[in-house]
Every structure is written in C-alpha cells, then in structure tokens.
Amino acid sequence: KDSLALWDVLSRLGYQAVGLHIELGIGEYSKRSLEVTQAFARERGLELLVVDLKEAYGFGVPELARLSGRVACSACGLSKRYIINQVAVEEGFRVVATGHNLDDEAAVLFGNLLNPQEETLSRQGPVLPEKPGLAARVKPFYRFSEREVVSCTLLRGIRYLHEECPNAKGAKSLLYKEALNLVERSMPGAKLRFLDGFLEKIRPRLDVGEE
C-alpha cells in the first residue's frame, strides 16, 4: 500500500515515476501482489517494470533464505535492496523513492539501536545521496504514519493487498512496531520525536557509511 500511495502522489505531482515490482516467489501471495500492482499501473497509465527473482536468479525468497541461512525477512530485504539499486543504475534512474513510513522507520531505528552498528545507523534517514554505483534514495513518507498512508489510499481509491506476507510471522520488526505502538498510545507523537531526535542530535555525528 505504501509504495502504491507514493507512486500515486509522485505521478500527480508531475514526476515521471516508473514503478518497480519484484516477484519474490512467495506462492499465491506474490501472485496476488503482482496482479494488484499491474492493475494499479494499468488503470493510471503508468510504466511498471517487473523483475521475477526466480527467472532472473533461479531462486525465490524461500530458497534464498535456506541457502543463505538467513531468516526470510532478512533475505527478502537484502535481495530487494540489491535489485532495486541494480535496476535503477542499469535504467539510468538517479533517484529511488520508497514508501517506507514513520512506523517502518521508527521500528528500524529501534532495532538498530538495540544492536548498534555505526555504519548501519549512519544510513538511517529520509535521504541518502547518490554514490558511484548507487542511486540516491529518498523516503518521502518518512514522517507520515502508517495510519495516514492508509487514509491516503482510501481517499484516493487505491486498491492494495491487505494480507500480511506469510513470511512476516515472527519477524523482529513486528515486535519492535508493537512496542513502539504501546509507547505511542501513552505518549502521542513519541515515534516522530524518536526519529527527529536521532536525525537532529545523533545522525550528524556519524559519517555516512558506504553501502
């Protein structure tokens, strides 16, 4: 939903935003996800690129997780980051825009602070500049909550896949989100203050690490 909402916003603002869908090979979930994305692009006359993980590399996320010894979510994130950048560089796109929202980014920061690594923390933020071999990355929804993004999809009539990825069960990111939601209920605005505080007081002290 986040990516579709962002694609809709960028296209309405006049950006020549080309969509990228990665077919991850996660059974019927991946099939339905592709169908929804293709329908969105078709209805709005937008250009969509599709990369099938199995066709391009011979394996999907489940197989990659077994081969690498990583949990499925980790293998998925790693493969998506690599492919997104590869396509951007090969197609000549200088900027990659992703739909990560406030809830996503707060959970990532929470996890990174629990297992702090300077290089990882240095890459945390709404903008990463272009580097040799790496397209610039931006996250326009960085300060918008998941609830706000959902409201956007409802107002714009954007149909999206409501079901969670079957591989997400037990993911640490869901635990982090649950913990932050608990804090947010008692302290409204806590997630945004958490992110803004990091960006204003900690991030400037870190060198932007290499990918």
Task: Please place each PLM-identified region on the residue numbering.
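ATP-dependent adenylation/nucleotidyltransferase module used to activate substrates
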Residues: K1-S122, L134, Y142-L155
